[in-house]
Design a protein with these regions (language model features):
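Positively charged n-region of N-terminal signal peptides that target proteins for export
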Residues: 1-7
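Bacterial N-terminal signal peptides
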Residues: 8-17
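Lipid interaction determinants
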Residues: 21-147
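Short helix-onset patch at the extreme N-terminus, typifying the N->h transition
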Residues: 7-8, 27
Length: 147
């Protein structure tokens, strides 16, 4: 009986300490509104009139949407008719400020199954996202949605 009581007391103590062991979510987790999209041109990043949002969940998912207001925008590896939409799982490494998304569905179906590694920097309610490979030549700035 004493062994059961000690075991129950230990389990109760461990259960009450569980929140102390819980990890804080990454600063990347949340809903973000695109404020600037820049593409490399002649060696410099230049703004392109895009709008969009990025949603990263604690459950380990990412969804992204972005739109060029030009209905005649040329397709890119990520867009069709000026629109980008994708969803997938995400693994975040806060110590290196990087993440990898494995695309599970996308408007541009060639993206499905691809792993995309990205760098991010969060400062307050602002986040800058860029490719790991600078030759991809783009950068996106987001602002966290507020209640």
């Amino acid at each position: 009986m004493q062994v059961k009581m000690k075991l129950a007391a230990m389990l109760l103590a461990l259960a009450s300490a569980a929140p102390a062991f819980a990890q804080n979510p990454s600063p990347l987790v949340g809903a973000w509104r695109m404020t600037k999209f820049e593409v490399a041109s002649e060696g410099k990043l230049r703004p392109v009139p895009y709008s969009g949002q990025l949603v990263v969940t604690e459950a380990g998912t990412l969804s992204a949407q972005a739109m060029n207001p030009d209905p005649n925008a040329a397709p890119t590896p990520y867009t069709a008719n000026g629109y980008e939409a994708l969803y997938g799982s995400i693994v975040i490494n806060d110590s290196t400020n990087t993440f990898v998304t494995t695309v599970q569905s996308a408007l541009v179906r060639n993206l499905i199954g691809q792993k995309m590694e990205r760098a991010f920097k969060v400062s307050g309610n602002r986040m800058v996202l860029s490719p790991i490979d600078p030759s991809e030549g783009w950068q996106v700035t987001y602002e966290r949605y507020q209640k």
